[in-house]
From Swiss-Prot:
Subcellular location: Nucleus
ZnF region ranges: C2H2-type: 199-221, 227-249, 255-277, 283-305, 311-333, 339-361, 367-389, 395-417, 423-445, 451-473, 479-501, 507-529, 535-557, 563-585, 591-613, 619-641, 647-669
Descriptive protein name: Zinc finger protein 534
Residue ranges of the TM segments: none
GO terms of biological process kind: regulation of transcription by RNA polymerase II
Organism: Homo sapiens
Amino acid sequence: MALTQGQLSFSDVAIEFSQEEWKCLDPGQKALYRDVMLENYRNLVSLGEDNVRPEACICSGICLPDLSVTSMLEQKRDPWTLQSEVKIINNPDGRECIKGVNTEKSSKLGSSAGNKSLKNQHGLTLQLHLTEWQPFQAVRNIYGCKHVEKSISDNSSVSPVQISFFSVKTHIFNNYRNDFLFSTLLPQEQKVHIREKPYGCNEHGKVFRVSSSLTNRQVIHIADKTYKCSDCGEIFSSNSNFAQHQRIHTGEKPYKYNECGKVFNQNSHLAQHQKIHTGQKPYNNKECGKVFSHHAYLAQHRKIHTGEKPYKCSECGKAFSVCSSLTAHLVIHTGEKPYDCKECGKVFRHKSSLTTHQTVHTGERPYKCNECGKGFSRIAFLARHRKVHTGEKPYKCNECGKVFIGNSRLARHRKIHTGGRRYKCNECGKAFRTCSDLTAHLLIHTGEKPYECIDCGKVFRHKSSLTYHCRIHTGEKPYKCNECGKVFSQNSNLQRHRKIHTGEKLYKCNECGKVFRQNSHLAQHRDIHTGEKPYSCNECGKVFRRNSHLVRHRNVHTGEKPYSCNECGKVFSRNSHLARHRNIHTGEKPHSCNECGKVFSRNSHLARHRKIHTGEKLYKCNECSKVFSRNSRLAQHRNIHTGVKPYSCNECGKVFSKNSILVQHCSIHTREKP
């Protein structure tokens, strides 16, 4: 049975764009579009009658002698000018024409009953006269429509010209399907079967029947949305990544953490930082059980167990487990210090070192200890400080078994065993194990004391000394003993105090066998045996075993009494005297005797009292061998042998061997009866 004649419109082989889509194409894509359209149009025209002009459309009453498709494309004009310039009217038989244009082929090509005209988006319709319906079956088979099974080879009525046309159409589809988003080339009957458009574009909401059309659409969006950094030339596919990158150049850090005030240029960095304050460490190492806040830190830590060090320095051969460590190491060879402080001009190899240094000028200490409230400029310092409260000392010396809070302290301790003192002072020749110790020592020769107390004007060589001194004014004592609740201004004092509860006495004198809780006390004790007094007063020539005694003695000449009681205003030359005096106001007697329970306001009084229970008398007179429990009483006794009477009455000039006798004598003049 013969089928009605079919019509094929130009839109079946056209590549269509909306006006918005056309603007998205770059010049190269637009040029390719024109070339393809010219080829499509000329191929279709070549299938018509011989006398059809190359510039004339084979259409329903439409001929473009001056405004033809080829001339439009050859002039490189945009397809949108055609829509605005062409005026279409209806001719008497109801078909559309361009005003003032005639074609002798229009009635012949478009008069068959049942013909359908398909318009493209410009309002132009191209109709091709076909004698039978079978060629559409061939087209359907070419494009794989499962609803029609008849092949072109089954029907001998298809002419070579018609087969040639479908070959052209297949060629156009196969060659240009990846360059543009196509209007479908399938016949109208197959379009009926494919009415659903399940593939939607997220950019503008347009939907497509096949996934390849959506893919081609997304390629245009991606090509249109490439972002190039004008500062460094780096290219990004998303606007969000481009915006993040630009903050590197501008220094913008819009994400702020409210706890410590630290700012970040990415939200992910803020999320990582929050784990520092929360203490969250979700990443666990199965080898040793150590936990980490970030997966990257865990991966880096694992290399300790494997011993993997893939990053090697070409200069010295030293290997590193992470690339950043190698990068930091290379600066040592180049000597480069690109990061300079704008406040003081000091330069640094690493940005992190500069950031740490800047807290010296700002005084910023954003990392707070939850136990005692102490602030730190670096998170590493806070982590190390926390071990003071927990008592954790994870770093152990393999030589002697001594344990330490930090790895740096263990490294410094190891040099005791190795005897390495690489850092030598050019002034006096003294050698030190660490560079920081040498730097601190050099201040002795220069006399420089750069750290000044704002309250009293006292200056110090070291910042730590100033920090400890400031606690005298503030009364701050952040270190607390868990056994008795006593508080201290310095951690070293707390550690020293703890040995009272444990009874630990590690340091023993080889001369007399006496043991001490602190090495400094042992060193002071040794001077008793040697008789060495290296510290001399420039004013009176008096010599002392300890530098602290010399400093204390100088106050006698200057009359300086920098320590003042907040309760009564009384001033003292020594801080220990002030601390002792405060017990008068508080009535506190923190020192208790384990034998009888008697309490004392001073530790020295407790030590003196203990000798009552032990019967110990350590102080012996060399003249008569008499022994005393106190050194002060031995000193008084010596005056008997020497005849020295250092205590003089201001009223009558009478002298006495003891201060107590002088006080008793003075009551005669004042007529006081003690």
